[in-house]
Every structure is written in C-alpha cells, then in structure tokens.
A protein has these predicted regions:
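Hydrophobic/aromatic-rich, well-ordered segments within soluble, folded domains that form packed cores
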Residues: 43, 47, 53-54, 104-120, ...
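Amphipathic alpha-helical interface segments within eukaryotic helical scaffold
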Residues: 79-141
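Conserved small/polar residues in nucleotide/adenosyl-binding loops
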Residues: 193-200
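Extended coiled-coil/helical scaffold and S/T/P-rich low-complexity linker segments
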Residues: 1-64, 131, 137, 152
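Amphipathic alpha-helical interaction motifs in eukaryotic regulatory proteins
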Residues: 45-50, 66, 70, 94-97, ...
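Internal amphipathic alpha-helical repeat/solenoid segments
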Residues: 58-73, 89-103
Length: 204
C-alpha cells in the first residue's frame, strides 16, 4: 500500500503530478526564453520578465538574469559573452561572476573555467570589462602570492592575449617566452609553456 506522503521530502503524492506539470511548464518557458535570447538578447530577457521568471528590480533582478544565463545550457555562448560585457549590463556581469568559485584555482585555471562558460567578445572594452570584474572576484578569494587586484587584471588580460597569439592561425609572428615575460615584468607570471600547451578555450 502506497503511503499518502513521500517519505524522503514530505511531498503529498496527490500533489506530485501538478508539481511535475509546473516544473515542465517552467522548463518549457526557460527554453523559450533561451530561444528568444539567442534571436535577440533583449527580447529573451523581456520574455522571461513577462513570464515572471525574473525578480522585478534591483540587485535581485540582475542576479536572476545571471542565474538564468549561468544555468541554461541552451543559451548561445557568444551572445552570452557579448550581453554580460556591455556597459548597461555591468550589474549582471558582477552577479554572474559571483556564481563562480575560484578559490582553489590559479589564474590560468580560473580563466579557463570562465571562458568555457561563454565566449569572450571581440571588442577590447568588453574584454576589459570582463577582465576587471574577474580580477575583483579572483583577488577577493585571497589567492596566495598575488599582490594586488591590478596584478590579477594584467595577468588575466595577458593570458587572453597570449592565448589568441598562440592559437589564432591568422597571427604570423608568434610571441616568444621572452616577449611574454617582458610584458609581465613585475607581475605574478603564469608559465608560458603551460599556456602554450593548454588553450584557454578551443577557439578564443
């Protein structure tokens, strides 16, 4: 004889079908929101707001947008990177970055985790915005041997530039170890050989 109440979570079994139905409906709405976002990001966010899937305002709204972008596997990674790095979305970028845990990572590993989540935009200002936010988040985790937030910024930006230099077929003159070390003089450096062997992303 089946119990009237699910032992593990206390859910009334008579309510379970409606709960599952609501979960399916929510999943379908999130998928539709991702599809709309992939067509035009602003439309996707507006759709999610219309469906009451986002907090109404303030930091909670930015966090709910960031959570959607972080959790949805259907969101286009290129559009995601472009969206969070725009000047008008810096609050979403900050909340999105806060959803990563870089505590046990060196800078190169942390950057790799970040760049697996979305594609970096091509515009220098947008890359700088992401790098600044990353540096603030990473330095807040109190990494050993890192002297300042600025050092994280320079190092992270250099990793992006070096990765592009080493793995972009359009670059004819590759950066040497000496070039890389010269660019990072006085900054905590990541091994050139380590970066040469491991791309930050497959097609940065």
């Amino acid at each position: 004889r089946m119990a009237a109440r699910h032992e593990s979570d206390g859910t009334d079994e008579s309510e379970l079908p409606s709960t599952l139905r609501m979960q399916r409906e929510r999943k379908a709405l999130l998928a539709a929101g991702a599809a709309a976002f992939n067509h035009k990001p602003k439309d996707g966010i507006a759709y999610l707001a219309q469906q009451a899937l986002l907090a109404p305002s303030g930091r909670e709204r930015a966090r709910s947008i960031a959570r959607f972008l972080k959790d949805s596997p259907l969101v286009d990674k290129r559009l995601l990177g472009d969206y969070i790095s725009r000047a008008e979305n810096v609050d979403v970028l900050a909340e999105y970055m806060d959803m990563f845990d870089f505590g046990d990572c060196d800078v190169a590993e942390a950057m790799r985790a970040l760049c697996e989540a979305f594609r970096l935009p091509g515009e220098a200002q947008q890359i700088a915005r992401i790098t600044e936010t990353f540096a603030r988040k990473y330095f807040a985790s109190k990494p050993p041997g890192i002297r300042s937030e600025d050092a994280v910024y320079v190092l992270a930006y250099s990793i992006i530039m070096l990765n592009t230099d080493l793995h972009n077929p359009q670059v004819t003159r590759r950066m040497t170890t000496a070039d890389y070390q010269r660019n990072l003089r006085g900054v905590n450096a990541v091994s050139y050989t380590h970066l040469r062997a491991h791309e930050t992303r497959e097609d940065l």
